[in-house]
Swiss-Prot record:
Pfam families: Ribosomal_S17. One of the primary rRNA binding proteins, it binds specifically to the 5'-end of 16S ribosomal RNA. Part of the 30S ribosomal subunit. The keyword Metal-binding does not apply. Belongs to the universal ribosomal protein uS17 family. GO terms for biological process: translation. InterPro entries: NA-bd_OB-fold, Ribosomal_uS17, Ribosomal_uS17_bact/chlr, Ribosomal_uS17_CS. The keyword RNA-binding applies. It comes from Delftia acidovorans (strain DSM 14801 / SPH-1). Keywords: Ribonucleoprotein, Ribosomal protein, RNA-binding, rRNA-binding. GO terms for molecular function: rRNA binding; structural constituent of ribosome. This is Small ribosomal subunit protein uS17.
């Protein structure tokens, strides 16, 4: 039986908040969690540095990032695809 292997790498979707570094974008991923005592839904966010080889992702784009081997001290993710282009203001 040949079954497709399920990828063990995590994927997240977030918004590019910085594209100033060479070949790197900073992606903010927001998630909703319920407060354990007050039962209020809160939004928590985390920032990840992701590798962007061609420099194709710009500020405000929504991108998908995939976990990878460590590429530098803080960079363990790779930007894999563009989900939504940033709207022009």
């Amino acid at each position: 039986m040949t079954e497709a292997k399920k990828s063990l790498k995590r994927t997240l979707i977030g918004k590019v908040v910085s594209d100033k570094r060479a070949k790197t974008v900073t992606v903010m991923v927001e998630r909703r969690v319920k407060h354990p005592i007050y039962d209020k839904i809160m939004i928590k966010s985390s920032k990840y540095h992701a590798h962007d080889e061609q420099g194709e992702y710009k500020l405000g784009d929504v991108v998908e990032i995939t976990e990878s081997r460590p590429l530098s001290k803080t960079k363990n993710w790779v930007a894999t695809r563009l989900v939504q282009k940033a709207a022009l203001v």
